[in-house]
Design a protein with these regions (language model features):
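Active-site-proximal alpha/beta segments of enzymes that process anionic O-linked groups
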Residues: 26-29, 41-224, 230-237
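Hydrophobic core
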Residues: 13-18
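Short, hydrophobic/glycine-enriched beta-strand segments
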Residues: 30-37
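Sec-dependent signal peptide cleavage junction
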Residues: 19-26
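Metal-dependent active-site segment of extracytoplasmic phospho-/sulfohydrolases and closely related
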Residues: 33, 45, 245-246
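Positively charged n-region of N-terminal signal peptides that target proteins for export
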Residues: 1-5
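Active-site-proximal segments of metal-dependent phosphoesterases and phosphodiesterases across multiple
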Residues: 237-246
């Protein structure tokens, strides 16, 4: 199973590289951030194409993404977006959704702000938690807000959803990196990006063809794209069900 995930990631690197090769001839100054959550440098460099790119044209850097009052994925994402350590409420109070006619009205009623394409419907919980219990003075959504203040557009593609007892458990916490001060992201696709695959953890995986097409779709109108692969997270969560042969 791990080999299959690595193979899929290698395909993604090739696909994204093709987008760069096409686009860089015409314009500069855009960023695609690919999140390989729950993996490490050794795993990444086991992909020959990625190792080759790092050797020829890449760099390796270290960043402290420790959160405030604990260390977990959501705090790490939010700390990147805040530019400093941040604390957050439980996952059940983090609820990123793509805008619909119904939830746009609910979001505006609760925040007083105009919704964008992707919104944290429970952003007030996170704001209160970080302001009242935070120890470092970091402000949620500083990265996304800085982009917005400079007329730069962010998009988020992908999720780390899993299936538990037949029910979909949503995880779109990648948006904590990209959101503004009010939990909003300009554009993206966090809903329709996975496909069923019984050979993969939780019987779902990222649709890499869809991921490629969506990246191309949002690239022209975005300055920064945050891509959540999801499969590395799902594999790590599922590993206790596997053995050395799988």
């Amino acid at each position: 199973m791990k080999k299959k995930v690595v193979s899929l990631l290698a395909i993604l690197i090739i696909l994204v590289s093709s987008i760069f090769n096409i686009s860089f001839a015409n314009e500069k100054g855009k960023v695609i951030l690919i999140n390989l959550n729950r993996t490490n440098l050794e795993d990444m460099l086991s992909m020959s194409i990625l190792k080759d790119k790092v050797n020829k044209e890449g760099y390796i850097g270290l960043m402290n993404i420790r959160g405030d009052r604990g260390t977990d994925d959501k705090r790490s994402y939010a700390s990147i977006g805040a530019g400093g350590r941040i604390t957050l409420p439980d996952n059940k109070y983090i609820n990123f959704e793509e805008a619909t006619n119904a939830n746009k009205e609910a979001y505006k009623a609760e925040t007083g702000k105009t919704p964008k394409k992707i919104n944290d419907m429970s952003i007030n919980y996170s704001l209160v938690e970080s302001q009242e219990k935070g120890s470092y003075g970091s402000v949620l959504g500083s990265l996304g807000q800085t982009l917005a203040d400079n007329n730069l557009k962010a998009s988020v593609i992908g999720n780390s959803d899993i299936v538990v007892n037949g029910e979909l458990v949503k995880n779109r916490n990648i948006a904590l990196m990209a959101m503004d001060h009010f939990g909003r992201v300009d554009d993206g696709n966090i809903d329709n990006i996975n496909i069923k695959d019984n050979t993969m953890p939780y019987a779902i995986r990222t649709d890499y063809n869809k991921l490629k097409s969506e990246t191309k779709k949002f690239y022209d109108n975005s300055d920064v794209i945050f891509v959540e692969l999801g499969d590395t997270y799902r594999l790590d969560r599922y590993k206790s069900y596997l053995n050395e042969n799988t």
